[in-house]
């Protein structure tokens, strides 16, 4: 019964690779079972483990960074909240300063105004009293002197007039009587003439014509009475002393000042609640940590690292598994090559083979791919040059050198892959830095807005306080100066009325009025002008808060610096990890550097040997060991050995394996397994014997 394909393969595997009592080395089956432990797969696995350890290190640092970031963000929120509340704290302090300054200013202003009012009041009263007293005395003396002169003059005039009248009246009376008789005679003549013309009798004109009777009886009794001197004496006694005016003016002057003093004292006793009127910006609270979602960001970072690690390790594991295939294929080819080599060596006189050629064969068997590379990359036209170039490539790709090269290459690969994981962390960092990068601008905007609002409100308050001071406090000064001016006008009018009441219609009226105007009225008008100037300038201007004084550049800079605290934690981690990665890169590059240094030494050696004609290589002889006897001289004509074809047993059929008696491999002791060469029968080498 024919065997199935699986059974045939199993039979072949067991017969070709099962250990026997004649075999002490691992055969093909054992060797293939270790192909997964090849240097490529192990290197990739080590790189995967390194990446996993790198990720675990990053995860641990990220956990610490998350905790630090949350604490730093909370501290940053508190710090930024305080910075955003700078207008509140500034306004609180400034409002206290402004309120205290205004209170002290108003209190000092009231006290100063009270002192000024008291001083001005007493000065005005003193000036008015001085003027009134001085010019009252002056007017009194002038009037008394004038009246005394007038009285003395009037006495002499009265005495002269009285004496003259008593002497002249009789003589005048005689003349007047004669004149009256003449006039009456003329009147009778006119009556007679009329009677003649009209025919009336004299009796008919009785009652119609009055006759002249001139008498000086009244003049006899005329005399200037002595009462005229009495009236002049009374004028002297009636000269005003202006005591009433003085008292009235003093009362009028004191009244407004007393009112102002009373109001100011009441204001001074009542403290100003300026602080309650000043506005204070509210405290601000920054809450960007909640918007930053720090745990979520770090979770995304860890998730990204895990995903990247899984992808990279999966690719490395797949590549490691894939590398098993060419290694297994290479191992199988090496086994086959050993079998072919054994067949070849069975036809060669080993004793006559050169030692170097045999080592060349062993090297080609053990390092097949290196042999392929050195044959492909060999240079030179002469044999010794090609041998030297092949030696160079074999030297720099020898296992020890190749191990150093692979360590450097795997180190660079690990560096690049770890750098890829780190780039994932860097990209995730952007989502954490975006919320905090705007903190500086937000803080500046909030501070500027709140300070601007506070500045406007405070300036409005200062405007109102300025108006209040000018209207209520200094308004009293304006009112008092106006009252003083009114009082002075009243005083001047009262004084003029007093002068008019005494000297009106007298010769002294103009003189007294002129003296009063010159010496009193003009002085008081100057005082009134001074009071008017005080009224015009009795106001204050409080300074305003300027926006330029509230600089926010330092605030913006400090806020921007504090806004980087959270992201700086990850940035420091990245910087530290990058430093470690570059240290690994430097180690890998150092390995490559050593390998390149050895390559350079080998190259120098080859160049030196290529110039040396006394090499061990003989240009007249070729060293070939490609299934041909290399012991013969190249100048001797080649004699082909008889060709022996190895019998081809039936595939996978144990019962068709040649018997030991007919098996051509049986005579060689090195042949342990008679059935081990059947697999190569499809391409069995041609054995040549010289």
UniProtKB/Swiss-Prot annotation:
GO biological process: plasma membrane fusion involved in cytogamy
Topology Extracellular: residue spans: 1-39, 133-308, 425-586
Localization annotation: Cell membrane
Glycosylation sites: 162, 221, 265, 273, 456, 485
InterPro entries (alphabetical): PRM1 (IPR026777)
Domain of life of the native organism: Eukaryota
Membrane association type: Multi-pass membrane protein
Secreted keyword on record: no
Gene Ontology terms: cellular component: mating projection tip; plasma membrane
Keywords of this entry: Cell membrane, Conjugation, Glycoprotein, Membrane, Transmembrane, Transmembrane helix
Family per similarity comment: Belongs to the PRM1 family.
Functional summary from the UniProt entry: Involved in cell fusion during mating by stabilizing the plasma membrane fusion event.
Protein's UniProt name: Plasma membrane fusion protein PRM1
Species: Yarrowia lipolytica (strain CLIB 122 / E 150) (Yeast)
Gene name linked to the record: PRM1
């Amino acid at each position: 019964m024919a065997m199935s394909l699986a059974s045939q393969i199993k039979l072949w595997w067991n017969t070709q690779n099962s250990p026997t009592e004649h075999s002490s080395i691992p055969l093909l089956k054992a060797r293939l079972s270790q192909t997964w432990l090849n240097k490529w797969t192990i290197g990739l696995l080590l790189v995967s483990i390194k990446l996993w350890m790198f990720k675990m290190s990053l995860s641990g640092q990220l956990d610490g960074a998350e905790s630090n970031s949350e604490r730093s963000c909370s501290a940053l929120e508190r710090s930024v909240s305080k910075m955003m509340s700078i207008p509140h704290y500034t306004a609180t302090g400034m409002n206290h300063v402004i309120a205290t300054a205004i209170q002290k200013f108003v209190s000092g202003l009231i006290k100063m105004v009270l002192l000024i009012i008291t001083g001005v009041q007493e000065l005005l009263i003193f000036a008015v009293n001085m003027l009134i007293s001085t010019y009252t005395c002056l007017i009194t003396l002038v009037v008394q002197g004038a009246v005394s002169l007038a009285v003395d003059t009037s006495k002499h005039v009265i005495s002269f007039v009285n004496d003259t009248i008593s002497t002249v009246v009789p003589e005048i009376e005689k003349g007047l009587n004669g004149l009256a008789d003449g006039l009456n005679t003329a009147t009778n003549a006119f009556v007679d003439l009329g009677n003649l013309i009209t025919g009336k009798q004299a009796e008919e004109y009785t009652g119609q014509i009055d006759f002249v009777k001139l008498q000086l009886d009244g003049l006899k009794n005329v005399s200037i009475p002595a009462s005229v001197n009495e009236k002049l004496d009374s004028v002297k006694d009636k000269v005003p002393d202006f005591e009433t005016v003085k008292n009235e003016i003093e009362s009028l002057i004191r009244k407004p000042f007393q009112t102002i003093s009373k109001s100011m004292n009441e204001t001074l006793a009542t403290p100003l609640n300026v602080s309650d009127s000043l506005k204070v910006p509210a405290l601000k609270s920054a809450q960007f940590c909640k918007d930053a979602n720090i745990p979520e960001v770090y979770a995304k970072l860890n998730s990204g690292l895990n995903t990247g690690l899984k992808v990279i390790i999966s690719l490395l594991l797949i590549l490691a598994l894939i590398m098993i295939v060419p290694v297994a294929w290479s191992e199988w080819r090496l086994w086959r090559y050993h079998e072919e080599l054994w067949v070849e060596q069975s036809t060669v006189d080993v004793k006559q083979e050169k030692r170097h050629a045999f080592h060349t064969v062993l090297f080609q068997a053990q390092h097949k791919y290196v042999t392929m590379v050195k044959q492909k990359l060999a240079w030179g036209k002469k044999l010794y040059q090609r041998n030297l170039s092949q030696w160079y490539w074999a030297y720099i790709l020898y296992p020890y050198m190749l191990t150093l090269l692979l360590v450097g290459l795997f180190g660079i690969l690990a560096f690049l892959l770890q750098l890829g994981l780190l780039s994932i962390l860097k990209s995730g960092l952007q989502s954490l830095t975006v919320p905090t990068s705007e903190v500086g601008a937000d803080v500046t905007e909030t501070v500027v807005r709140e300070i601007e609002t506070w500045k406007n409100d405070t300036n409005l308050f200062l405007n109102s306080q300025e108006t209040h001071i000018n209207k209520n406090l200094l308004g009293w000064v304006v009112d008092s100066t106006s009252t003083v001016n009114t009082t002075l006008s009243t005083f001047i009018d009262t004084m003029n009325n007093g002068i008019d009441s005494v000297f009106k219609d007298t010769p002294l009226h103009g003189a007294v009025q002129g003296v009063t105007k010159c010496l009193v009225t003009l002085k008081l008008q100057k005082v009134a002008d001074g009071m008017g100037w005080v009224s015009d300038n009795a106001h204050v201007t409080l300074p305003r808060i300027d926006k330029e004084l509230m600089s926010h550049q330092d605030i913006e800079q400090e806020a921007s610096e504090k806004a980087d605290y959270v992201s700086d934690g990850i940035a420091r981690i990245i910087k530290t990890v990058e430093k470690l990665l570059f240290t690994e890169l430097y180690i890998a590059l150092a390995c490559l550097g050593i390998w390149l240094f050895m390559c350079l030494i080998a190259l120098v050696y080859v160049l030196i040997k290529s110039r040396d004609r006394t090499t061990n290589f003989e240009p007249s002889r070729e060293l070939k060991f490609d299934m041909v006897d290399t012991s013969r001289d190249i100048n001797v004509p080649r004699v082909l050995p008889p060709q022996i074809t190895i019998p081809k047993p039936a595939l996978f059929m144990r019962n068709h394996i040649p018997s030991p008696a007919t098996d051509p491999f049986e005579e060689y002791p090195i042949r342990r397994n008679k059935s081990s060469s059947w697999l190569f029968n499809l391409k069995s080498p041609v054995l040549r014997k010289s």
